[in-house]
Curated annotation (Swiss-Prot):
One of its GO terms (cellular component) is mitochondrial inner membrane. It comes from the Eukaryota. Its cofactor is FMN; [4Fe-4S] cluster. The gene is Ndufv1. This is NADH dehydrogenase [ubiquinone] flavoprotein 1, mitochondrial. The modification Omega-N-methylarginine is found at residue 257. It comes from Mus musculus (Mouse). InterPro entries: ComplexI_51kDa_subunit, NADH-UbQ_OxRdtase_51kDa_CS, NADH-UbQ_OxRdtase_suF, Nuo51_FMN-bd, Nuo51_FMN-bd_sf, Nuop51_4Fe4S-bd, Nuop51_4Fe4S-bd_sf, SLBB_dom. PROSITE patterns: COMPLEX1_51K_1, COMPLEX1_51K_2.
């Protein structure tokens, strides 16, 4: 029986199985969180165990990898699609679908997998924990993902500042080569696959997939116009898929345990487990693996020891890294941490980097500092981003002092809207959204600050 289901804004036919014998369907899951230890994928997140090959083998990495490879690309892609895994780098595009774009007849050009380890989003530090404490998960994930795409090699593009992470990753790659797990006849599967590490130089813009490809090729890291998309013309002009570290690292476990197992966590279209970074005004900042759709309040109170001064001292939360709009305490009470719930709350999951701000925070200054970051990191290729973000930075600097008129709040909103969606890459969007979140939820704070400044200025003029 065929039915229609909403999927990424459209309708696609899906097969629905109906059990006529009982007349009832299985109840939908309504509570999320409290992930059991046996369901965790990243079992060495805190570096308590040996991260080298010997320790990785004890924790189940590289288990039956040969069997996975021999089942072939179609089987791997099928499991990834069944799992419902969506990209963990921020965009949330269905991974199985994205990887399938590469699974087409060869035209003679080699195919490549590029792993985006250029983690530079303020507040985000999940990928570096994988590379530092569980590097073999990433190396094995490259092999499995590469097999699904028919790729010849993987390039792991790692942020230049991640010296220790790059060192551990390089050691893990060497161990895998020496053990015959990658390279010629990887895992005895008659599949040849190489893994290379490329060091970045600290540019945030190189986290954008086409700028990253340009950097690998030795060019200036500036985003390309699309189309052509990387799956057609990527690194060195060859078909390429760019994937996030976490996305790649979970793929072997999904293949071993089954896509259905992974899909059993979280809400529909938001399945699986996820690494969350919790920082800011919490008692115990941490990186934790939890079930998707876990309530934000539970995530903070259970894993981070709660907000400093108690939950009532909470002012706002940035739920998905610096490029996602903040949400006030009233929204934080009930919101779930997944793609769809946060979009409904007028923000986004992003990289799932939760930045907590209590009532001691100067919220205007905090957002102004983020805009300064984006102004510094803009490549300057697109006029709306180059000029607009610089303009927003100057206006926000005056807003911090209150040296502005209330009408300028609407002007700033309009500037952000002129940047959003009018640039080659999403850096402009990432700069616009924090400003929009501030105006949406803290407009009275901006107006009060301007009023206080005006009163002080009049008093100063009268006194002088």
């Amino acid at each position: 029986m065929l039915a229609a289901r909403h999927f990424l804004g459209g309708l696609v036919p899906v097969r629905v199985s109906v059990r006529f014998s009982s007349g009832t369907t299985a109840p939908k899951k309504t509570s999320f969180g409290s992930l059991k230890d046996e369901d965790r994928i990243f079992t060495n997140l805190y570096g308590r165990h040996d991260w080298r090959l010997k320790g990785a083998l004890r924790r189940g990495d590289w288990y039956k990898t040969k069997e996975i490879l021999l089942k072939g690309p179609d089987w791997i892609l099928g499991e990834m699609k069944t799992s419902g895994l969506r990209g963990r780098g921020g965009a949330g595009f269905p991974t199985g679908l994205k990887w399938s774009f590469m699974n087409k007849p060869s035209d003679g050009r080699p195919k490549y997998l590029v792993v985006n380890a250029d983690e530079g989003e303020p507040g985000t530090c999940k990928d570096r924990e994988i590379m530092r404490h569980d590097p073999h998960k990433l190396v094995e994930g490259c092999l499995v993902g590469g097999r699904a795409m028919g790729a010849r090699a993987a390039y792991i593009y790692i942020r230049g500042e991640f010296y220790n992470e790059a060192s551990n990753l390089q050691v893990a790659i060497r161990e895998a080569y020496e053990a015959g797990l990658i390279g010629k006849n990887a895992c005895g599967s008659d599949y040849d696959f190489d893994v290379f590490v490329v060091r970045g130089a600290g540019a945030y813009i190189c986290g954008e997939e086409t700028a990253l490809i340009e950097s690998i090729e030795g060019k200036q890291g500036k985003p390309r116009l699309k189309p052509p998309f990387p799956a057609d013309v990527g690194v060195f002009g060859c078909p390429t898929t760019v994937a996030n570290v976490e996305t790649v690292a979970v793929s072997p476990t999904i293949c071993r345990r089954g896509g259905t197992w992974f899909a059993g966590f979280g809400r529909e279209r938001n399945s699986g487990t996820k690494l969350f970074n919790i920082s800011g005004h919490v008692n115990h900042p941490c990186t934790v693996e939890e079930e998707m759709s876990v309530p934000l309040k539970e995530l903070i109170e259970k894993h981070a020891g709660g907000v400093t001064g108690g939950w009532d001292n909470l002012l706002a939360v940035i739920p998905g890294g610096s490029s996602t709009p903040l949400i006030p305490k009233s929204v934080c009470e009930t919101v779930l941490m997944d793609f769809d719930a946060l979009v409904q709350a007028q923000t986004g999951l992003g990289t799932a980097a939760v930045i907590v701000m209590d009532r001691s925070t100067d919220i205007v200054k905090a957002i102004a500092r983020l805009i300064e970051f984006y102004k510094h990191e803009s490549c300057g290729q697109c006029t709306p981003c180059r000029e607009g973000v610089d303009w927003m930075n100057k206006v926000m600097a005056r807003f911090v002092k209150g040296d502005a008129r209330p009408a300028e709040i609407d002007s700033l909103w309009e500037i952000s809207k002129q940047i959003e969606g009018h640039t080659i890459c999403a850096l402009g969007d990432g700069a616009a959204w924090p400003v929009q979140g501030l105006i949406r939820h803290f407009r009275p704070e901006l107006e009060d600050r301007m009023q206080r400044f005006a009163q002080q200025h009049r008093a100063w003029q009268a006194a002088s």
